[in-house]
Structure formats: C-alpha cells, structure tokens
Regions:
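Aromatic-lined carbohydrate-recognition surfaces of secreted/lumenal glycan-active proteins
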Residues: 1-8, 135-175, 217-229, 260
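Active-site-proximal loop/short-helix segments
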Residues: 105-132
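Alpha-helical scaffolding within the catalytic cores
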Residues: 25-27, 170-179, 201-210
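The substrate-binding groove and active-site-proximal loops of carbohydrate-active enzymes
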Residues: 6, 19-21, 72-88, 132-139, ...
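Active-site-adjacent "subsite" loops/lids of carbohydrate-active enzymes
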Residues: 39-96, 243
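Substrate-binding cleft/loops of secretory-pathway carbohydrate-active enzymes
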Residues: 13-14, 158-198, 232
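Substrate-binding cleft of secreted/luminal carbohydrate-active enzymes
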Residues: 192-199, 221-301
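Catalytic domains of carbohydrate-active enzymes, especially glycoside hydrolases
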Residues: 1-31, 96-105, 181-187, 246-255
Length: 301
C-alpha cells in the first residue's frame, strides 16, 4: 500500500511514497509543470475559462454547469466536453505536462451531471452517433481518456484517472463507465473529500465499494486542509486518523492526502503522532499499513 501527498503547491513532504502537484486545479489557475512529481490536471472543471468564455460552459434544461446553479452540487464551473477548441488545448496541455512530470493524474474528465450537455453541438453529435443518450456520453468520456492516455504514454509516464465518489450511478450521471475506462487507466483515484469525517463508516463503505467494482488499482483521496480554509472548517486530526485507518483496511491500493501546501500536511503529521488516545484506538482497527505510516512519521519529528 502506498501513501501520497496531493498539494496545490509544487512541494514534496517527507514521509510519503509519492507526491502529486495540482498543476491545474478546477479553479483554472495554471502552474508550471513540475518534474519528479505526478502532475494533476483538472480537465473540464475550469472556473477561469468559464468566466472568460461563458459560451463554453455546459448547459442543461435546468441551467448551466456553474457553481451558482443550486439545482446541482457543483463545487466549480464545468465546460462542455465537446468544444473542439478547448478539447484540443487541454490534450496538448496534458502532453506538455507529461514531458516533464513523473506521471499524470486527471480529474474532472466527465460530463457535469445528469442532463448535461444539451448544447446544439452535443445534441447534434449525439444524433449523428446513432447511440442512446447514455451510451453516447460514455463514448465521449472514454474517447477523451483514450486520447489523453496516448499523449501521456508517448512519454512513457504512468496515467491515473480521477473519478467521482458515486460507485452506482457514475455512468448515468457523468458518462463514466468504469469497465470502459479500465483499459486506459494505470490506476484510479477516488476523492472522498469532506470537511468532516465524523461518520467514518460511510467513507469506508465508499472505499470498499470502489475497490470491489474497479478493475485497476484504487487510490482514495482524503481532505486535510484546502486553500482558504480556517482551522474550524477542516476535519479534526482524530477524524482524519480514524477515516484513514478505516479506508486502509478495505484493501485499496493507496491513500492520498490533499492539502493546500507542504506545511499544512506537516502540521497534520505532527499532530497525528501526538494524538495518543486516537492512535491507541485505531491500533485495533486492523489497518497495519496505515499504522506503519504513522511509525514512519514518528521517526521524522
């Protein structure tokens, strides 16, 4: 089992097996590709381009794929997948990052949600395909991932595909068919982000479900401390330890920890090894690999 950092800054944190830099998060703010790290790219979640090019935003009968649309649970603005100009640009961006990075992880690779996208271009492409609506959306997502993989593998780099945490309806909602994507992904990353992990069994159930249905290695991404967060808005150290231990015992292949920067993650490491009461509790959870990680952290501080 491997453990990784997942940061908005191009920094490494000692005590982890690998490191991911959010080169292009859903905010749309773009950094510089970083060598000796995995680079993460949010594909169709892009607040900056949604603001610059409102005509690129995915649309539905219930409104656009914007954070302001209360009929959906959008945490960022989402672009139409079939926009040829943006699609070509993001594929080139992925390849340019792959030239430099240790590997590439993608997120926001899908349609916004059920009902998207019904722009004239998408409707016409769907009709021309001869497929039903669900199958056309699956084909669109899968073809994008296939092309992205070609760009990454041209440079001989690992290729991880990020999903959304819905193990049942991802196909119908987002056009994500787990089996169709499996031949192209070296591994899958599933974010189970929350600002509270008080009900850890729920997140354990999600992790266990994804390990069961996915046909490639599975990495679970856990939320520690995001940009702009205040201390009272993030999970407690006890919650993070318990949910990590529970997820680790599900048989997943690894866990990533998202944080704003290296210092936020170091602060978590230091607090974790001092949480003696919680560590005593989780020592009985049957999560040997996670407890070994804690032992590694103890040697650092």
């Amino acid at each position: 089992m491997k453990f990784g950092s997942f940061l908005f800054s191009p920094e490494k944190v000692e005590g982890f097996d690998f490191h991911v830099y959010r080169l292009k998060p859903e905010t749309g703010v773009i950094g510089t590709p970083k060598e000796d790290m995995y680079n993460n790219i949010a594909c169709f979640g892009d607040n900056v381009n949604a603001q610059k090019h409102p005509e690129w935003v995915a649309v539905s009968k219930d409104g656009p794929a914007l954070r302001t649309n209360g009929k959906y649970n959008f945490r960022w603005d989402i672009l139409c997948m079939t926009n040829p100009e943006y699609r070509a640009w993001i594929l080139d961006f992925i390849e340019n990052a792959a030239k430099v990075a240790s590997g590439i992880t993608l997120s926001s690779i899908h349609f916004a949600d059920h009902g998207f996208c019904v722009c004239p271009r998408c409707v016409e492409l769907w009709r021309q395909s001869g497929l039903n609506w669900v199958d056309w959306r699956v084909q669109t997502v899968t073809n994008f991932i296939r092309e992205a993989r070609i760009r990454v593998k041209k440079w001989g780099k690992p290729f991880f595909v990020g999903l959304l945490p819905d193990p049942v309806l991802s196909k119908e909602r987002f056009g994500i068919d787990f089996d169709a994507l499996a031949p192209y992904a070296d591994a899958f990353i599933v974010p189970i982000f929350s600002k509270s992990y008080a009900t850890a069994w729920h997140f354990e159930t999600l992790a266990r479900s994804f390990k069961h249905v996915l046909k490639k290695p599975v990495y679970i991404n856990i939320y520690v401390y995001g940009p702009g967060d205040k201390p009272n808005e993030v999970p407690t150290v006890s919650e993070l330890l318990k949910v990590s231990a529970r997820v680790a015992r599900t048989g997943v292949d690894g866990i990533l920890f998202l944080a704003e920067n290296a210092q936020r993650l170091i602060d978590f490491q230091k607090a974790a090894i001092q949480a003696e009461e919680t560590l005593q509790e989780i020592s009985g959870y049957g999560s040997e690999e996670f407890m070994k990680l804690i032992d590694r952290w103890k040697k650092l501080f």
